[in-house]
Amino acid sequence: MAKRHVIFVVGSTATGKSEWALKLAQEFNGVIVNCDSVQLYKKLDIGSAKPSKAEQALVPHYLLDYVNPPEEMTAGNYCRDFYAILEEIPADKPVFVVGGTGFYFMAIEKGMYPVIPVPVEIQAQVALELETEEGAIRLHAEMMKADPEYGAKIHLADRYRIGRAIELIRSQGKSVTQIQAEFESQRKPFPFPLLKIGPSWDREVLRERIGQRVEKMLAAGLIEEVQGLLDEGLASWAPISSVGYKETLEYLRGGISLSQLQEEITTNTHQLAKRQRTWFQRDKDIQWFDGASGFAEVRTVVEKFLKP
């Protein structure tokens, strides 16, 4: 019986990972599963650099154009649907999972901490105590006493994490460190052979690629795409807060000029790419290849990985 093989194609925005995934899926008779948290949504095409309909027709694509507005997708739901979709894909077809949303990749590979319900009255009491500086200091001290290992990582100003830790301590009788250790002890390994690859670029070259992409997005009708979303009453839809959309929304509301729009999208995309690069560089299992000249080498690595 064929053993399913999964290939993560990861990297920062504008690195060409989607192009690599498409070429590889065509050559090795595979499928593509989207792992970009914006490309999941219908109606978000230009600003998310979603593959064109012609490209999507070349190989089967999953979790792309998947969620209808105004619905929203959580990482937990993505992880659930990812594994459900794998059941639909023949085991002999390699699965190329492509995107830049590192948290989603981590969720499907390593699982997610369970969402532990906390009684409303405890939530309300903790929220009340956090309203004052003195209350936050007391709760921080309570956290440090019950969970010094976790508490040492949390700054006094991070009231959200302080509050969540106290909610768990009071409702579960366990520290965050204990809960995390229990989860880790039950964590199951990824169930399929896994290869992780990604294109890498010199930072200045990537900066140029990002600038070119932003120009193309605006020329392709990004402003009209966002205006259409506004016309449908989707101004408060959470995905519109993503890079490219939030700046265009500000432009349409008269907050910035057209030249400022291009500049802001470009700057914020650079910052996004930096965050993505930092996230993925922590994963030492990812094999990086030159974005301009490394595809032949990537192809060889994938071919070897897929050999029975």
UniProtKB/Swiss-Prot annotation:
Q: Which domain of life is it from?
A: Bacteria
Q: Which GO terms describe its biological process?
A: tRNA modification
Signal peptide boundaries: none
Q: Which residues cross the membrane?
A: none
Which Pfam families does the UniProt entry name for this protein?
Answer: IPPT
Keyword set includes Cytoplasm: no
> Per the record, where is site Interaction with substrate tRNA?
T101
- EC class name: transferase
Question: Which residue ranges are recorded for the region named Interaction with substrate tRNA?
Answer: 36-39
The molecular function terms of the Gene Ontology recorded here are: ATP binding; tRNA dimethylallyltransferase activity
**Cofactor(s) this protein cannot do without:** Mg(2+)
Task: Give the EC number(s) listed in the UniProt record.
Answer: 2.5.1.75
Residues annotated to bind ATP: G11, S12, T13, A14, T15, G16, K17, S18
- Which UniProt keywords are present, listed alphabetically? ATP-binding, Magnesium, Nucleotide-binding, Transferase, tRNA processing
Catalysis performed (reactions): adenosine(37) in tRNA + dimethylallyl diphosphate = N(6)-dimethylallyladenosine(37) in tRNA + diphosphate
Annotated binding of substrate, by residue? T13, A14, T15, G16, K17, S18
Assembly and interactions? Monomer.
Q: What does this protein do?
A: Catalyzes the transfer of a dimethylallyl group onto the adenine at position 37 in tRNAs that read codons beginning with uridine, leading to the formation of N6-(dimethylallyl)adenosine (i(6)A).
Q: Could you say which protein family the record assigns here?
A: Belongs to the IPP transferase family.
Q: What is this protein called?
A: tRNA dimethylallyltransferase
What is the taxonomic lineage of the source species? Answer: Bacteria, Pseudomonadati, Bdellovibrionota, Bdellovibrionia, Bdellovibrionales
